[in-house]
């Protein structure tokens, strides 16, 4: 259980705050009035009381970190002058570009997506991609 004595404690790229977990991009996962009772975590939202458990909170953190990684990658791909990012679905970035030098452009995109973020340089990332006239899986 995280208690007030843990506030300010850092766990890798995460920092524990009162009723929240601060993420490496400055955003936070908030759990208002978080408490532990009768073997479960409880917090309050505008909709009422939410009961949850430790693994679900861990899943929230993992999903938030993954979202930060893909968003940062998407912004880097968007900065490439030869492509326009048009869609992002889960762990995919879909971009439009010229057929001219498409292999070179794809290699640039893959290098971006394989580069771990500065806040977790040992994160193992891999990527694959393809060039197509139409969107396909």
Which residues make up each language-model segment?
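Conserved catalytic core of nucleotide polymerization and phosphodiester-bond processing enzymes
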Residues: 1-137
């Amino acid at each position: 259980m995280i208690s007030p004595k843990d506030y300010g404690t850092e766990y890798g790229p995460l920092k524990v705050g009162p009723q929240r977990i601060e993420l490496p991009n400055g955003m936070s996962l908030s759990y208002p009035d978080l408490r532990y009772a009768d073997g479960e975590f409880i917090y309050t939202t505008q909709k009422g009381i939410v009961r949850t458990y430790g693994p679900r909170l861990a899943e929230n953190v993992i999903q938030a970190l993954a979202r930060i990684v893909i968003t940062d990658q998407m912004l880097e791909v968007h900065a490439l002058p030869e492509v326009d990012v048009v869609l992002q679905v889960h762990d995919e970035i879909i971009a439009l570009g010229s057929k001219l030098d498409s292999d070179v452009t794809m290699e640039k995109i893959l290098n971006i997506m394989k580069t771990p973020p500065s806040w977790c340089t040992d994160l193992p990332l891999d990527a694959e991609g393809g060039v197509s006239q139409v969107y396909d899986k």
